[in-house]
From Swiss-Prot:
Disulfide bonds: none annotated. Pfam families: MMR_HSR1, MnmE_helical, TrmE_N. Mg(2+) binds at residues 235, 256. This is tRNA modification GTPase MnmE. PROSITE patterns: G_TRME (PS51709). (6S)-5-formyl-5,6,7,8-tetrahydrofolate binds at residues 20, 85, 124, 459. GO terms for molecular function: GTP binding; GTPase activity; metal ion binding. Its main location: cytoplasm. Disruption phenotype: No visible phenotype. SUPFAM superfamilies: P-loop containing nucleoside triphosphate hydrolases, TrmE connector domain. Its cofactor is K(+). Binds 1 potassium ion per subunit. Gene3D superfamilies: P-loop containing nucleotide triphosphate hydrolases (3.40.50.300), Probable tRNA modification gtpase trme, domain 1 (3.30.1360.120), tRNA modification GTPase MnmE domain 2 (1.20.120.430).
Length: 459
């Protein structure tokens, strides 16, 4: 492989920026642009050490940057190659100059995710661990971070490998049965082992799939839509949950004319919070577009926060909103409790049909804790302890596990129907291959390229 280089930190002003190199010539290329005290070279130092010096533009020896350089020699590195990390002052110009000098001396600009891809190709991590790197970067809550860390440490990989080993052992018994069909006792034993092993694998796959709903919540967040008539406090609710003024709050109905999104962490529950334009009939063409978008977002929501005005009587529009969210996960919020109550709370609870109803005065910042508790209890009836289970949160993994479950079910069905043993072998092999796709043991190169292209440059 050639030697790659990229800026590994976000571009912009900051305390430190890092240029990373990885490959067989990483140390030699770095030496060409590094000037150490008393003529020290990076090739002469011990691995896993850091050194002060300057990056210079040779042959003029013009000093470009004052740096600290980490030297990490193969194979004890993330990529299992020689790795150099040049720690520069944060900024745009100088760090770019350092990168350009490295490229001029023979490094190639890395593709997105190429450092992690090399870690995978060199056997440092498997595919599920590589995907967990991106999950860790994108984690919005402590729980999501813990789930990603568990996957990075190989918890899912170990489970998948054990299941594949069980299937492989079962296939070995099938092979014996095919090779020695004349022995009835072998056939009987094979049948018993097949049922036991296949049933056990199926149960473990089902256990993993049961974690997928909460796993996806942790990974992607709940699509949470705030709805209600104009001027009931939807934007105030968004701002209270986000703790920032993201939406315009006025007394004028229809102020929010579009969909406003924000990612928030509510007691460990990641929410993709969406504030919609008030749903009502309107002649204003701009507001009408916002209302249509609100209706579309509503259809795709995981959770609805339906806001009503505590100081007004329940309107026909309010009732229609309840009808629009029938059968969905809804929390009803009676806002403006600081004003004289006029709403029929018994009628509201009747329309809520057992779903949570909380009261708030967003103006006085009252009732937010009750709302957060309702959100948490609705989705985590028992608090998730990410250390207790292996969670599946990746859509690709979920799809593969569903296919593997069907394959093992087909194998069990074939055994029950006494189909030829070599037909059962096909289904078992299919399940074994599918599970291999999760960890990258049996996956097409184009899929690998696609997965790593989603990473940021320098990772």
């Amino acid at each position: 492989m050639d030697t790659i280089a990229a800026i590994s930190t976000p571009m912009g002003e900051g305390a430190i920026a890092i240029v990373r190199l990885s490959g067989p010539e990483a140390i030699q290329i770095a030496d060409k642009i590094y000037k150490g005290p008393k003529g020290k070279t990076l090739s002469s130092v011990e691995s896993h050490t850091i050194h002060y010096g300057h990056i210079v533009d040779r042959p003029s020896d013009r000093v470009v940057e004052e740096v600290m350089v980490s030297v990490l020699k193969a194979p004890r590195t993330f990529t299992r190659e020689d790795v150099i990390e040049i720690n520069c002052h944060g900024g745009i110009v100088t760090v770019n100059q350092v990168l350009q000098l490295a490229l001029r001396e023979g490094a190639r600009l890395a593709e997105p995710g190429e450092f992690t891809k090399r870690a995978f190709l060199n056997g440092r991590i498997d595919l599920s661990q590589a995907e967990a790197v991106m999950d860790l970067i994108r984690a919005k809550t402590d729980r999501a971070m813990n789930v990603a860390m568990n996957q990075m440490e190989g918890r899912l990989s170990a489970l998948v490998r054990r299941l594949r080993s069980e299937i492989l052992e079962t296939l070995a018994h099938v092979e014996v049965n095919i090779d020695y069909p004349e022995y009835d006792d072998v056939e009987e034993m094979t049948h018993q082992i097949l049922v036991e092993k296949a049933t056990a694998v199926k149960k473990e796959i089902e256990t993993l799939l049961r974690t997928s709903e909460q796993g996806k919540i942790l990974r992607e967040g709940l699509s949470t839509v705030i709805i209600g008539r104009p001027n009931v406090g939807k934007s105030s609710l968004l701002n209270s949950l986000v703790h920032e003024a993201k939406a315009i709050v006025t007394d004028i109905p229809g102020t929010t004319r579009d969909v406003i999104e924000e990612y928030v962490n509510v007691r460990g529950v990641p929410l993709r919070l969406v504030d919609t334009a008030g749903i009502r009939e309107t002649e204003d063409i701009v507001e009408r577009i916002g209302v249509e978008r609100s209706r579309q977002v509503l259809k795709e929501a995981d959770l609805i926060l339906l806001v009503l005005n505590y100081s007004e009587e329940l309107s026909e529009e309010d009732v229609k909103l309840f009808e629009a969210v029938e059968g969905m996960d809804v929390i009803v919020i009676l806002n403006k409790t600081d004003l004289e109550p006029k709403i029929d709370t018994e009628r509201v609870r009747e329309l809520a049909n057992g779903r949570p109803v909380v009261t708030t005065s967003l103006l006085k910042e009252e009732g937010i804790n009750d709302l957060e508790e309702a959100i948490q209890s609705l989705f985590y009836t028992g608090a998730i302890e990410s250390g207790d289970l292996t969670y599946v949160s990746n859509t690709r993994h979920i799809t593969i596990l569903q296919q593997a479950k069907r394959a093992i079910e087909d194998a069990l069905s074939g055994i029950e129907q006494d189909v030829p043993i070599d037909m059962v072998q096909i289904d078992l092999t299919r399940c074994w291959e599918l599970l291999g796709e999760i960890i990258g043991d049996s996956v097409h190169e184009s899929l690998i390229d696609q997965l790593f292209s989603q990473f940021c440059l320098g990772k």
